[in-house]
Amino acid sequence: MKTLHKFTTLAIATVLTLSLTGHSLAATAHFTDLDHIQGKDQIEALYNKGFIKGIRDHEFQPNATITSAQGVQMIVNSFQLSLAAIDFNVAPQASDLFTKVHDDAWYTDAFIIAILNGVNLSADIDPAHKLTREEFTSYVIHALEKDSNLPLIRINPVDITDGTDLNTHYSGTIQIAVALGITTLDDKGYFHPKEEISRADAAVMTYNALEYLKAHPRQS
């Protein structure tokens, strides 16, 4: 389990005046374990849109590390990814695409939908794997690219203090996420790429990405 970092506060500050609903972020609280959590309003906003669920009915477990299954499901739901625009001769099975994703699990459809919509999931991804900050950030940016003009945006590289620790497969998407304010560095410029990401931090990052998409829709 991981506690929230102070960079979460910075990320939240960039979007406090925005809302997924067009109204105030404040809404009737559903979860009972968010009282002292940075990102409480963002989590509740995602819940009220039907994008995320708790571990139990009124329990989000914000400080728990998010698993691959939970993270992929959050991204698919939040970005409303689907297979509607893809034609298949035969419907794909998880076992055709992954080695560790079962064909009949609660998360099965999310993994299939995510990878076929361009989210860079590895074939050997383990649904129980605890996601790191760099992994989840990369997944979010790939989902965001589906409905935005990100490939056309010129990004000025950001100086990341622990940039040499980044997996080269994720460094580009992390640069985008930091540059666009979807995630932030801590006050010393560290990203902490290998650190496990909490469910609260993952939700805040997802919220920020949706707010960016709302403010910068794809241009025809």
Tell me the role of every PLM-derived stretch.
Residues 2-40, 53-69, 76-106, 116-134, ...:
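Feature responds to low-complexity, polar/acidic, surface-exposed segments characteristic
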Residues 109:
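Conserved active-site-adjacent core of cysteine acyl-enzyme catalytic domains
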